[in-house]
Design a protein with these regions (language model features):
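Extended catalytic cores of very large enzyme megasubunits
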Residues: 1-359
């Protein structure tokens, strides 16, 4: 704890915050992500939980993104990738040959995860995302089947509004494919279902203003951030402990948590400067400074107060708590912007971070 809080205070050039950070962690008000525990304030690894890459449709770029994912895994992160730009199996390629399709390239990432460990702590993990209207979608849903060459990957299917509506309206082929999605979830617990239009309707205003599309989520499917060929999104995560909500709700805890995560992000930026395979993630971190302050212990708070999980009182408390978290974190990012400046993407927005909250 001392190592982590010292590093965070130093990154903010505010040594006086060390004690406050330490108190929050020791009291159990804030729970840190595994990479922060393992790597913050050390010379090894990075304190970031998750990464996502946008895989382009050329051999050179695919191999570069594979190298990026291997490096991200090596330094301690969970990884994911969007494969919707890859051409379908059997389509023509520039040397008069035929493409082996999006799913075949996922095998490279599957093999990498079987080989590389996350900062020497745990086996690598990767989630592949593909659009349901991609011609290789049916083959994609066979991942993890008995006998399938891909066994280690997690996978998510992207479903746009138009496709869902046509399926509901009775399109026979779409209904067959949707049945296969549901069957796969029943048998394997996968794919994640990612409703792309819904996600993009609810993304932060800055992403709407710059028309930045969110094409995929992360390994755990709780982060909604945009990636592109030259920017790979990262998740800078920790959680507030709702079981102890009554202890910290009238304190500066949420503000301190946002400050702490911004310090974690600053450490990531400093450590990845000049790293060839982490340049896209470094660029995203600098330009977006996206944070994900989540929660844990929600059920414990309800049990402690003897509140039924599905009752109206629980719903009202949910609204109260998350409104409080949002208000406090918004004020914190505005204060950070005044103290340290706005990043490139947020010039004129009066804030330091594109996102603040996660699950």
């Amino acid at each position: 704890i001392d190592r982590i809080t010292t590093a965070a205070a130093q990154r903010l050039y505010k040594p006086e915050l060390k004690e406050a950070f330490q108190e929050m962690i020791e009291r159990g008000w804030m729970s840190l992500s595994s990479p922060i525990w393992a790597n913050m304030g050390t010379e090894r690894g990075l304190p970031i939980s998750c990464f996502n890459v946008h895989v382009p449709d050329s051999i050179e770029d695919i191999t570069h993104k594979l190298g990026e994912v291997i490096m991200q895994t090596k330094i301690g992160g969970g990884t994911s990738g969007y494969f919707g730009n890859l051409r379908e199996r059997g389509s023509a390629v520039s040397d008069n040959g035929k493409s082996s399709g999006a799913v075949s390239f996922m095998k490279l990432f599957d093999t990498a995860m079987d080989t590389i460990s996350q900062g020497g702590v745990r086996r690598g993990a990767f989630a592949a995302y593909l659009d349901i209207d991609h011609p290789d979608a049916e083959e994609f849903l066979n991942i993890k089947d008995i006998g399938n060459p891909i066994q280690n990957l997690f996978f998510g299917i992207n479903v746009p509004d138009y496709w869902m509506q046509e399926m509901i309206d009775g399109d026979v082929e779409k209904r067959k494919l949707w049945a296969k999605v549901l069957e796969s979830r029943q048998q394997k617990g996968l794919p994640y279902i990612f409703f792309t239009d819904n996600v993009n309707r609810n993304k932060p205003q800055v992403y709407k203003d710059f028309n930045m599309l969110i094409n995929a989520s992360n390994l755990c499917s709780e982060i909604m951030l945009p990636s592109s060929t030259d920017e790979s999104f990262i998740c800078c995560l920790s959680s507030m402990n709702l079981e102890l909500y009554d202890e910290w709700k009238d304190t500066e805890a949420v503000k301190l948590a946002v400050f702490f995560l911004d310090a974690v992000l600053q450490e990531f930026i400093a450590k990845t400067e000049g790293n060839y395979y982490l340049a896209s993630a470094n660029k995203f971190a600098k330009r977006h400074r996206a944070l994900g302050l989540g929660v844990l212990g929600w059920h414990s708070l309800l049990q402690k107060r003897m509140i039924p999980f599905e009752g109206m009182e629980a719903k009202m408390l949910t609204t109260e708590i998350f409104k409080y978290l949002q208000d406090k974190s918004e004020k914190a990012t505005q204060e950070l912007a005044r103290m340290y400046g706005e990043p490139e993407l947020l010039k004129g927005y009066g804030r330091r971070n594109t996102t603040l909250m996660a699950i």
